[in-house]
């Protein structure tokens, strides 16, 4: 049984750790910021980094600091290595952006709440954009949504890693409820038919977007 602290990632020096608090869609509150500031000062955290997934990485702590830091932060763990949904990134959408056409933050938070804690064959990342400017990088995420005047466009199979892939459009002009429902069907299809550690992009390539459409749209 591993004696590594829970919710921590060993760093390259093999001595220090990083933790990633869960911050749905990059949303923070003054209380969360106060807690992070207080804890990082107390435990002398040398690096505080905003990640590409709209999360905070607290980096460089000794092993013995990890558990008390989590206790004092009182935040959930943002999963970063497990086979599950890692994050949902979202642009501001209609909440504040003058270009927003759909409520990207609203649907993004709902998606994260639905899938947090659920296991999948590989890590999964969502990108939600409230307009076609696509600031949520929707075409480069495992599952993406892009808002238009006529509703949501659902994209699957994107990847921004070492072998980048533009995702395939699964459906267009979806209402918010339709988008969430179709994502649910796709995630179930992926979970039940993918091999372990096969990312969504590879799964879509292997299966074919037409076969996926027949399976989840029929």
From Swiss-Prot:
GO terms for molecular function: 4 iron, 4 sulfur cluster binding; heme binding; metal ion binding; oxidoreductase activity. [4Fe-4S] cluster binds at residues 91, 97, 131, 135. PROSITE patterns: NIR_SIR (PS00365). InterPro entries: NasD-like, NiRdtase/SiRdtase_haem-b_fer, Nit/Sulf_reduc_fer-like_dom_sf, NO2/SO3_Rdtase_4Fe4S_dom, NO2/SO3_Rdtase_4Fe4S_sf, NO2/SO3_Rdtase_FeS/sirohaem_BS, Sulphite_reductase_assimil. Keywords: 4Fe-4S, Amino-acid biosynthesis, Cysteine biosynthesis, Heme, Iron, Iron-sulfur, Metal-binding, NADP, Oxidoreductase. Siroheme binds at residue 135. GO terms for biological process: cysteine biosynthetic process. Its EC number is 1.8.-.-. This enzyme catalyzes the 6-electron reduction of sulfite to sulfide. This is one of several activities required for the biosynthesis of L-cysteine from sulfate. PANTHER family: NITRITE REDUCTASE (NADH) LARGE SUBUNIT. This is Sulfite reductase, assimilatory-type. It comes from Nitratidesulfovibrio vulgaris (strain ATCC 29579 / DSM 644 / CCUG 34227 / NCIMB 8303 / VKM B-1760 / Hildenborough) (Desulfovibrio vulgaris).
């Amino acid at each position: 049984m591993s004696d590594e602290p829970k919710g921590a990632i060993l760093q390259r020096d093999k001595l220090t750790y990083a933790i990633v608090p869960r911050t749905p869609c990059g949303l923070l509150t003054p209380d969360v910021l106060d807690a992070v500031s207080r804890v990082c000062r107390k435990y002398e955290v040398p690096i505080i980094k905003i990640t590409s997934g709209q999360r905070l990485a607290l980096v460089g702590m000794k092993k013995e600091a990890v558990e008390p830091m989590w206790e004092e932060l009182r935040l959930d763990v943002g999963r970063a290595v497990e086979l599950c949904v890692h994050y949902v990134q979202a642009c501001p959408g209609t909440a504040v952006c003058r270009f927003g056409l759909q409520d990207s933050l609203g649907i993004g938070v709902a998606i994260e709440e639905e899938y947090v804690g659920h296991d999948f064959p590989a890590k999964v990342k969502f990108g939600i954009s409230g307009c076609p400017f696509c600031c949520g990088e929707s075409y480069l995420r495992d599952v993406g949504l892009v808002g238009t005047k006529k509703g949501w466009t659902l994209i699957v199979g994107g990847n921004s890693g070492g072998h980048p892939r533009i995702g395939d459009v699964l459906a267009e002009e979806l209402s918010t409820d339709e988008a969430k429902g179709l994502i649910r069907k796709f995630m179930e299809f992926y979970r039940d038919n993918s091999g372990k550690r096969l990312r969504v992009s590879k799964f879509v390539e292997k299966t074919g977007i037409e076969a996926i459409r027949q399976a989840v749209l029929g």
